[in-house]
Amino acid sequence: MTSHSAVRIAIFAVIALHSIFECLSKPQILQRTDKSTDSEWDPQTCPETCIPSKNITCSDGCVCVKLGEEEEGTCFNMTGVDWLGSPSDD
């Protein structure tokens, strides 16, 4: 009788572990809490580039964005972004 109980517990454990593995291995679908279709962040490229190391900056209203170790960056107008500021604002 003891072996019968052990087999039942082992089968239950295998099914439980398999269920947990299946649930964790599937990608979770994240839903937006904000149902609006308007984007709060709408970056537009400005017609210029920037090189901060040579003190070549973007015009007013545009922000310099560099990728990795590149010397030259692209200027973007960040419409609708209220979190931009200089590091000294912290």
UniProtKB/Swiss-Prot annotation:
It is found in: Secreted. The keyword Ribosomal protein does not apply. This is Evasin P1126. One of its GO terms (molecular function) is C-X-C chemokine binding. Glycans are attached at N55, N77. Its main location: secreted. Transmembrane segments: none annotated. Disulfide bonds join C46-C62, C50-C64, C58-C75.
